[in-house]
Amino acid sequence: MKALFRSLAVLVATASFAFAGTEGWVTNWEEAKAKAKAENKPILINLTGSDWCGWCIKLHKEVFSQKAFTEYAAANLVLMEADYPRKTELSPELKKQNAALKKDYLNEGYPTVLLLDAEGKKLSEEIGYREGGPEAYVKHIQELLAKTAKK
């Protein structure tokens, strides 16, 4: 029984960290804005429930962790994750920051993916999971950015 409990604890801990520290993603809002300014890139912010939201988990697994997306994002976006987990405790600072981001940007539900300029001005908003995989997701982002560039 103890071995089963230990195995389950390891599995939960591993799953909890599957999203945290994902390569290329920052979790600090000020860092994301500074990086966006320095690199002259828009911010893609993912408001997610990484350990409880099925659509968020699917989006991460099928899009955000795939090579087609990560390569495009590395060259063209600043990636930020604002997580609202139920099983993982965030630091008080991160909780406070994410609560403010939720108040400012979350209107309907998870996942919410926003494209923002370096000042935090909303360029576009996507609520829920978008079918089609990483290539289609990248194409959609490119189209959204092209539309905002024309404005």
Which residues make up each language-model segment?
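Boundary at the C-terminal end of the N-terminal hydrophobic targeting segment
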Residues: 18-20
